Every structure is written in structure tokens, then in C-alpha cells.
Amino acid sequence: MSPNQEPGTTARVFGHEFLWTAQHPRLQDIRKMLHTYDELASDALDRLDVLSPPSDKSPGGCPMQKRDLYALLERYSSSDQAIGRLWNQVTDIPDWVDWDQIRRGQKFVYQYYGQVQLCLLFTSLLGGMGAWRIVETLSRTGGFGVNVCRRRLLETLLHFVQVVESLDSIKPHGRGFASSVRVRLLHANVRRRIMRLEKQRPGYYDTEQWGVPINDLHQVGTVVAYSVSLVFLSLPRMGVFCTEQQIADYLALWRWVGYVMGTPVDWMSTPATAKAMMEAVLVSEIKPSSNSQIIANNILAAQTNSPPLYASRQFLAALAYRLNGEELATALNIARPNIWYRSLAGLQGAMLNLSSSNYALLPQAWQARRDKKLIQYSHNMVTNRKIGGLEGTTIFELQYMPEIGRMTEMGRVNISFWQRVTNYIVGLFMFFSGMIFLHT
């Protein structure tokens, strides 16, 4: 049963209270997007398989391994109609794109980089697992098992770093742009794979209840998690209250990224309509299931005592409660942290806010130097295997293949007391050395 959306009616969802207005989309309307999807990418992917068949095609028909689909897309864009349609869509710049505003959105990230990264991990990713329909797709890929989850998180972080590293990176042919297109084609491949398995064994994936895998609504929800919920929910919980200009600039960045990734983005034309969509999506989609709990806890387990901060499970849980609120964190079955770890989480937020407070006062040359160091540090953290990175970059190929009978299970990481103590000391060293690096 849908809630009463009469304008002026109060709604409350996991600690967030708001009034329904005429700007809010009707739930029955946004739920129609459960059954629509990015057909441009699907059609282009089918043609790429014909023009450049994979050399190592699996028996299950999952043809994406060892191919850079972005390079192939560009190569065949002028000679194939379906591929050309997708290429033209991502390279023809819409009238609403303002590169100066997008650059300001990137610089907003630089100012609050530590806070934004924590919000992305604990709200966009971990908290986003409360979306009960989305996790049905994620559970079937196996990419959020505890032993492989960290790589999945690093790939997501790499994409984000490439998106914000420079304006040229997010423009057509740039590194962040290319990664966004690769992720779009990855989504098309996962969707196709799951639908083939459903056809092979009816009941494997319930499209009536969950919608098409990686549908338009869930694409919207993903962009909401990375942008709107971050500025309206997550950052304020860390004590960062964005100005109207900062909000508009950051949303402009993600409107463009979402567009490149094949997401409907008209609802992002103003911060007010974006906030209204966020609230409607929260009411419609955030209902944590048992699979939500499994994946959320696997994310925590994968990050426990891992570089760069080597944080304990209790400290990570405290961050999860701080950034998602008591209700959602409890619904995700995250163990409740004690007052000590909650205090540490609050102290970390205060230190990050103190570090960010002087950014706007710095001369532009100093800001540019700090920004450059920040991007270098981030790339090193993600790609340097010696400190827990990926050992290089990635082309976002399909590594976690949906299979009949494969579902993500709850995992755990065992670590001794002395390892925890050592990791705690190393984590403190990494945190403070990183702060010193950025400010010298």
C-alpha cells in the first residue's frame, strides 16, 4: 500500500522527516522505472559482441572478460548504427552542462574530501544496501562476498577519484568519462546475464517484484546515494552544512556523470527537485532485507583492520551509525557500538572539519597544490598494492559472474588481538601522516 502523498502530509523514513509537496514524484510513477532500462547500452553491447567477439567466452555466455569495451565502442562508433547511437549520446553535450559549475563541484569534493569519502563508503554503499530490490541483483553477482568485497569497493573508489580528479578527466575522452562509460556497459552485461539465467531457470530472478536488473529507478537511486543524500543527509550528520551554491555545484557534477552512465537525470535540474526525488526513492526502496544485512555486514568485515586506516570493526560500526542514523543501521543488523567508539567517530569528524575549515581561505596557488597532492594520494591509495590497493588501474570488466545457485553469504575475517593492536597503531600513523602530507 502506497503512503498518502497529499501535499502537506508528514512522512518519515529511517529518521528523515519531511512534508510531501507537489514537487515530489508520485511513487506509482517512479516505480514504473523498475521495468525500464538503458536500452542504448544493451543494444551497443550486443553489437560489440558481434563485431569483436571475446576470445575467452565462457560456457555461460558472459562475453566481457579481457576486453576494453570503451575502446571498442569508440573504434566502431562510426561504422555501426547501434554503437554510434550510444557514442553520440555520451559525446553530444546537453545544453544544461556548465563546465565551470562542474569544476566547482569537483573543488567542493577537494575541500571536504575526507568527509565525502566516509559518506560514500558508509552511506552511499553500506547504507545503500537498505534498498531491498537492488541487493537482489548484487547478491547474485558474488562481488560482495567478504573475500572479494574490498576489491569491489576499491574499484568504486577509483571511479570516483577519476570523476573528480580534473575537468578534462570527466569531459568526453577523459579518464573519468571513459570509466563512467565502462561502468555503464558493465551494468548492461550484468543485466543481460541475469535475464538469460532467469530465462534458463524461471524463478531465478523475480522481475515482477524486483524489476529489470539494474533498471532506471535503481540507476536513479545510485546517483541519489552518491550526490543528493550526501549533501542533504550524510554531510550534515558529520557537521558539514553545505551552502546552496555548493549543493547546486556538486549536483551538477553528478547530473553529468549520471547522464554519461545512462541514468535519467531530468529530476536533477534543481536542488529542490533532486531532494524531492531522493525522498520519494527513500520511501519507495529503502526496506532492508536479510540480503541487505548480509552485504552491509560484509562491507564492514572487508574494511575491518584494512588499509589505509586499519580501523576496528567497532569503530567502523560507530561510523555506520553516525552517518546512517540509528534506525537504518539497526535495520541493517550492524552491531551497536559503545560510547567509546561513538566518541572516536565524533572526534574523527571534528578533526576532518577542522582540516577543511581553512580551505576557502587559502590562496588559489596553495589550493591547487593541496588539490594535486590529494589526487596523487588517492590514486596511490587505490592502485598501490603495497598499501592495500588494486595493483594498477581497472577497465571495469565483469569479474563476478552471476550463476544459478550463487548468492552472497555472510562472511567474517579472523584476526588476533595483537594484530588488532598493531593495526590500530598503524592506522593512527597513516591518518596523521596523510593529514601532514596534505598540509605541507
Name every feature range the model reports, one short phrase each.
Residues 1-224, 229-440:
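Mature, function-bearing regions of proteins
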